Amino acid sequence: MHACSIRDLKKEYVLKSETVRALRGVSFDVPEGDYVAIMGPSGSGKSTLLNLLGCLDQPSGGELLLGKDNVATMTDDQLAEIRSRRIGFVFQSYNLIQQLTVVENIQVPLYYQGKLGAKERKRCVDLAARVGLQDRLSHRPTQLSGGQQQRVAIARSLVNDPYFILADEATGNLDSKTTAEILSLFNELNAEGRTIIMVTHEDEVAERAKRIIRLRDGLLQSDRLNSPESRQAAAERALALIPDPQDDEEQTPTPIPVEA
């Protein structure tokens, strides 16, 4: 089964008297368990495709299936239902609620469904542990690093068992070390069978995915697989860029003794 299927997808906007064709007939499938990076320059249609995949907008033509649900024929209320229950969003800016704890932030999608029982809370605690935050359950976002906040966002994206995780520049605000950690977490989740669709402008981030789709001028420019060897090489290059803490220690200047 496919997590999503796109057939001749089109999106047009009317700006004053001009019609902008943001997507001109894009087609591809994302099988369950795939890990796809979507890339493209400004104006390629990447953001438009992201909005359609996230059920934030509807296509002007073509077909978009999320699982068995045809998004192209849905009402606004139906789209909202799909967004809240079947898509796991991970944003560049985390989008956490500052007044809530780690567990409460993970639980937000369930809150809107009225699912606030002990069973649901345990699931949120388990997801926090899955992303390495078992010792931060009662912390609020201001008490967490950027990487820890993104881990909360990833756990939140999993709470409804979505068709796929839709990650929009998820490492854009992170340093090289934390980026490597988050991408390793995505790899682990994908190895467990999770489907991940990641939008990025960074080649090194995209090379960690199983597959790279490139858009240009509203069309599918290329769709290629990454070999396991190239993915491993990208991971090793990323690790090589992480500063060694010992280097900082070695470069620390020796204090100059002050004469009495």
Where are these regions (language model features)?
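Long, low-complexity, intrinsically disordered segments
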Residues: 252-260
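Conserved beta-strand-loop-alpha-helix hinge in the C-terminal portion
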Residues: 219-246
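ABC family nucleotide-binding domain
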Residues: 2-209, 215
